[in-house]
Amino acid sequence: MVNGVLLLHKPVGMTSHDCVMKIRKLLKTKKVGHTGTLDPEVSGVLPICVGRATKIVEYVTDKSKTYDAEITLGFSTSTEDQTGETVSVKPVKEPLKEADIKAVLDELKGPQEQVPPMYSAVKVNGKKLYEYARAGIEVERPKRNITIEDIALTSPVTYNEDTASFRFTVTCSKGTYVRTLAVTIGEKLGYPAHMSHLIRTASGDFSLDECFTFEELEQQVSDGTVAEHAVPIDRALNHLPKWVISDTLAKKAENGSVFDIPAEFSAMTADARIAVCTEDGECVAIYMPHPSKKGLLKPAKVLMQKSEQ
């Protein structure tokens, strides 16, 4: 049985849900969940939680993402990427200055609001935006708070008839639409634009070179080694502070007990989470400050019961 995170190199042409369904069949288990949607046209790092690790999906999803992207200026599209219909056109007749591009990218660093594209899975009034878009209905989209942690130009500008393209890398908070970011970059440079290529190169500290293709995963299943290649739950939670406890306290944590906040976590905020682990590194629960009882910790998520060990 696999209890960990499989690092999938998602191929182009599959939805994230397609990937989950394929792994469910491959591993013959329903306990599979992905950690952040990638559009079908996008490839790259897609962590897949399996077994007990499905309980930590939200914590893995919270991590920052890094992408290598290509933007093409000269025309915009209905989907903000290369798959949509042309919406507006403005030929690029003058060379773009690298200094201007870098200035725009620097300007975009930091916290900001972003309006998700109409062709997206964001829900408004219980329906996904792409359902409205396919029906030709434009609806008001709620702004989302995002953070661009880092963004940098990674290629020279190339020109092709009436368009110009360049590549950039961006590290951003969850929920950021890089294709919308590409449109914003184009606007700031004075041109309609769209995202012409995208690959996710990292999700938190999981990098592309750690990922496996479906073919490799199938071979691991055949060899009986797939569990060995899964990222353990404790490593998947290494962005959370860890509280190491005795086996006696671990048993209480597995039963959902409330604890006094340890001195080293006395300054933790209401939205903070800590991973509670045994001395041998097994994470048994995720704890949070008690909302109504000051000075106490309560379980936000119990990851393991004794019956599962």
From Swiss-Prot:
InterPro entries: PsdUridine_synth_cat_dom_sf, PsdUridine_synth_N, tRNA_psdUridine_synth_TruB, TruB_C. One of its GO terms (biological process) is tRNA pseudouridine synthesis. GO terms for molecular function: RNA binding; tRNA pseudouridine(55) synthase activity. Its EC number is 5.4.99.25. It comes from the Bacteria. The keyword Isomerase applies. It catalyses: uridine(55) in tRNA = pseudouridine(55) in tRNA. Coiled coil: none annotated. The active site is at D39. The keyword tRNA processing applies. It holds the Pfam family TruB_N. Keywords: Isomerase, tRNA processing. CDD domains: PseudoU_synth_EcTruB. NCBIfam families: TruB. Responsible for synthesis of pseudouridine from uracil-55 in the psi GC loop of transfer RNAs. Belongs to the pseudouridine synthase TruB family. Type 1 subfamily. This is tRNA pseudouridine synthase B. The gene is truB.
